[in-house]
Amino acid sequence: MNESPRASYGSTGAHPGYDPVLVIDFGAQYAQLIARRVRECHVYSEIVPWDMPVAEILARRPAALILSGGPKSVYSPGAPRVDPALFAAGVPVLGICYGHQVMAQALDGTVARTGTAEYGATRLRVDDPGVLFDGLPTSQQVWMSHGDSVTAAPPGFRVTASTPSTPVAAFEDPTRRLYGVQFHPEVVHSERGMDVLRHFLLVGAGCRPSWTMINIVEEAVTAVRAQVGNGRLICGLSGGVDSAVAAALVQRAVGDTLTCVFVDHGLLRAGEAEQVERDFVASTGVDLVHVKAADRFASALAGVTDPEQKRKIIGREFIRVFEESARELDARAEAEGTHIGFLVQGTLYPDVIESGSPTAAKIKSHHNVGGLPDDLQFDLVEPLRTLFKDEVRRLGEELGLPEDIVWRQPFPGPGLAVRIIGEVTPERLEIVRAADAVVRDEIRRAGLDREIWQVFAVLLADVRSVGVQGDERTYGFPVVLRAVTSEDAMTADWARLPYDLLERISNRVVNEVGQVNRVVYDITSKPPGTIEWE
């Protein structure tokens, strides 16, 4: 791990009571998934770049290291390398896929281009249970994705598993606490992958499973109190789970010194504005300012069809409305002899990773609160910035938030405006809102609302489709049904919904939603498509 310029990863600077497991990222699509799986074993984890110097890694006092997979071959020009000093530091290490190979190469094993690649589900034969496979079946399905293979383990290692095409599918040196697997234990297709990770963390590395929701809540409350003291705070509620959980957590820490501003832009799904005003306040007791600005946003969006322009307009208006509310609240606070000094932000750990934010992170643009004037600059309070989405949901449950808020599916900041392909008008909003309500109701009735990452309706407002309804020829709008499964929204697959469910959704939409005479199902994955249409 050299001193070359490296990718910017945001350091969370949090949880000093935990010695983290550091996931060293070699450019893997699964790096975040590995970190999440570690946390599912109740062990705290963070992601760092592959070229972080060894001294900097060790300064973080890691309990263990996991070397991720990556898209390169170890023989590619400029391929990431590992400083062998890392393996002499006495820290337990697990190499996964590319990490397995780069460990072997650094410690004088052999990595070869065998000409036989493995992709997808593969049968693994356990030849020696060792630490990783102790108590597990001798034959199990694993998920492979590699071209090169380790053909000889480094000196001092013993081979513990193989496949028909990979003679060294796993190895270990328990004396030095070094382990490697060619497969991906973090993906669900590896049948006993979580057991392998758990064995490494709890047995091989001796980590303590102390990363629990109760501890997270207690620690976050303490941290917020220490940061803000007696200061006053403001939070922009979007109606989504992130801002709701952030506000609820801060409310528990500081009570009535927090005021939440809910900017209702008129672009939410059916019943959401009422739910925020009723259920969120009832469950938290938070001081809520509900700004009803639907007419203002509708006027600003009139005649606009370009999706980027929609986003910019909505972001601009959101900032202006929030700014006006913040000024009013700050003036009221000053009249009482206080001042609003803090802004609560629902930043999550993936945002920190992707933005490379330092500890004082910038406001997320998709939360539509960025770009506030100089005289309204607040110190940021980001109580969720070390958490993944699934952890935020569990935290919301721990805080007693209503299930409908905690398990609300991801929703774009511009709301239904980007689910109308064409100009946004009040009439079209009612159409897509009604269609979306039918879709979500049927998915909920089918018991699939937690299995599907996102499901929604899109209105093709600039398209007219010919149809026959009541023996009359019609020209109505087509509605697109979009349903995807995903782990983290970085990639997504279209959901294989049952035909009878698709039929019920289609029948209800064309019969209950005016001006719609056709429903189509989008079967595009991400990539090449995106989850949203705009």
Swiss-Prot record:
Entry EC no(s): 6.3.5.2
Pathway the protein takes part in: Purine metabolism; GMP biosynthesis; GMP from XMP (L-Gln route): step 1/1
Active site residues of this protein: C97, H184, E186
Catalysed reactions listed for this entry: XMP + L-glutamine + ATP + H2O = GMP + L-glutamate + AMP + diphosphate + 2 H(+)
GO cellular component: cytosol
Binding-site residues, ATP: S238, G239, G240, V241, D242, S243, A244
Highest taxon above the source species: Bacteria
Stored SUPFAM superfamilies: Adenine nucleotide alpha hydrolases-like (SSF52402), Class I glutamine amidotransferase-like (SSF52317), GMP synthetase C-terminal dimerisation domain (SSF54810)
Keywords: ATP-binding, Glutamine amidotransferase, GMP biosynthesis, Ligase, Nucleotide-binding, Purine biosynthesis
Domain Glutamine amidotransferase type-1: 20-210
Residue ranges that the Swiss-Prot or TrEMBL entry lists as coiled coil: none
Entries under InterPro entries matching the protein: Class_I_gatase-like (IPR029062), GATASE (IPR017926), GMP_synth_C (IPR001674), GMP_synth_GATase (IPR004739), GMP_synthase (IPR022955), GMPS_ATP_PPase_dom (IPR025777), NAD/GMP_synthase (IPR022310), Rossmann-like_a/b/a_fold (IPR014729)
Span of domain GMPS ATP-PPase: 211-408
GO molecular function: ATP binding; GMP synthase activity
Complex formation: Homodimer.
HAMAP family xrefs: GMP_synthase
Function: Catalyzes the synthesis of GMP from XMP.
Name of the featured protein: GMP synthase [glutamine-hydrolyzing]
